[in-house]
Amino acid sequence: MSRSANTTAVLCLLLCTFFWGASFPVGKHALNEVNALTLVVWRFGIASVCLYLYAKYKHMPLPTLTPKQWAWAIGVSIIGVGGLNLGLFTGLAQTNANNGALIMALSPLVTSLIGSVAQRQFPTRGALFSLVVCLSGVLLVLTDGAFAKLLGFEFNHGDQIIFLGMLCWSLYTYLTQGISSWMPMIPYTLVGMLSGLGVISLMVLFSADVHPIQESLAISRSVFGDLMFIGIFGTVGGYLLWISGVKQVGATNASLFFNFVPVFAALTAFAYGQQVTALQLLGMAIVIAGLLIPRLVEWQYQRVGLRNA
């Protein structure tokens, strides 16, 4: 790969993780004026329109699939896309944006562990090291440094909901690896957005406390900007940038950039005037170290092996 192509890939991945990280405090700010379900409807609605227009522009027809394949793709999308967004934004209404970003930083690791269980393979030493270190960093933040809370399972309810959303997304990510062999990713993502929109819309219909139309008409310009940012940049833009980066540097190298999500979340939260504590920064550093150290050790072994070859 040329240096210019490599630089472009790095910029794409950094911009992508900025969009994703910023979506946490931006979403937290929007929840001051709209219900979590209303926010998710906006996100899915905007993303669906943008992805549809992109697919039409690129002349991407819907694939020809069997009813079983359609059912599987829609079902997995409802669990993953719907579960993530429902858990994330419902949880953010009750917890700190930085906590949410830290919990979501566990997703690549959890996806790897799900793969190990599904394939009946024992996780690698690097994966186990990352699991212990990263969980320690996350639990440090979620318990406010009082690990005695673990004995009584005393966690913030919002943190628990986001954790469940992260599990849904990790399962979705693993299952998507199989679906991608027979369904292109852009149409698959569009199906995911439409499936999520349908499920959340049904939930809104049966939720007496949620009034998306009235809430949308009453929002301020800043919150309208928040919703547009989450829908366009935090969803569609981030996804397309991620695909572009992965194609150029590979999935393994690209996954390292996921470590920047909590960093950008903290920076954006600070810009919004939201609280960023020293404990959260320490937990963030521990999580990033837990994810990076095994990769750096592996790279070092590979370099030594190439020198000795």
Protein language model regions, located:
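Transmembrane alpha-helical segments that form core, pore/gating elements
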Residues: 51, 111-113, 117, 148-211, ...
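Juxtamembrane helix-entry segments on the extracytoplasmic side of multipass membrane proteins
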Residues: 5-9, 33-37, 41, 64-71, ...
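Helix-helix packing/entry segments at the starts of transmembrane helices
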Residues: 17, 40-42, 81, 85-86, ...
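Hydrophobic transmembrane alpha-helices of multi-pass small-molecule transport proteins
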Residues: 51, 123-145, 259, 279-298
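Specific transmembrane alpha-helical segments of multi-pass solute transporters/efflux pumps
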Residues: 19, 23-24, 52-104, 140, ...
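Hydrophobic/small/kink-forming positions within alpha-helical transmembrane segments
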Residues: 18-21, 25, 52, 77-82, ...
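Alpha-helical transmembrane segments of compact multi-pass small-molecule transporters, enriched
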Residues: 11, 23, 45-50, 103-117, ...
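Glycine-/small-residue-enriched transmembrane alpha-helix faces in small-molecule transporters
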Residues: 1-41, 151-178, 200-202, 309
